């Protein structure tokens, strides 16, 4: 099909829930993608921080292809070798003991909150309150929607799930004012992504940990976007040393294949009993092959340390743009290869300018250019992205 036909057919049948660019993607290799008209782009968005190893990484392609030829799906009523292998590497990467596999970040967060609710109610029937942060994003299922701190996502659905409280991100006094013994969990992103790439202080996270301990509330870190070496550590909580009670993951853990879940320490392993939670597709052999290949490749290629190094280089280059355009760039922040460049005006024209110059970036929170490239991006490709941003800023 040609571009026009593909777009028309998609628009005819797909629910109109996405604001799409008029592009048809066809091929990816490394950090580059091509549309069906042959145009090549440097991708600094990675499918929203998903394609950890870039496109068509040979180890990942081989693992998925070989597993597809053996066993694509198997009920969790039975054991598989590839799931056992995937569980071990996820436990090692997260620093946790027990894993539950799901299919998307919202599912992982939903399961984490469900476990926290059961934990709380087992202590007291009124211990079910969950506190999360303004400007957060945790998913679009009904409970994750209630935990998400954006009014935009709440409008038009009537009453949201009860028992959720929102407080300003980074404000320990606001959190303390809401904390009591009826709180079963505090759910936070260790770095806010959708809210504008906001990095909290270590002190704030340490104080949150202390409040949770004081009130016997579980600390849940949503690492859907920050996890899997994205910030220059296996998981972002490792920067502060503040370990959560529940850690959720998704996006980059499958290298492009849909996988998600949550991880807990041994002391929470038996909050759920058989039948309390589950899922038909979570932890299927194909997904587990992707997880195992992705995590072992990140380790063997030393990508955690490389991300920290390249992220510092990238951030410094963005700061040079801030110095060059002080009236247009108001802040540069982030960690590793999760970076945000805040601009004085709307961010959308900058994204569109970059796209016209064959570079893919994203705008979040209205005026923050979000940069979350594949972990394998080279310095030469970083320079291409920075040059496109420079050109966009000069023109706006």
Label every model-predicted segment.
Residues 1-396:
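Conserved N-terminal phosphate-binding loop of PLP-dependent enzymes in the Aspartate aminotransferase
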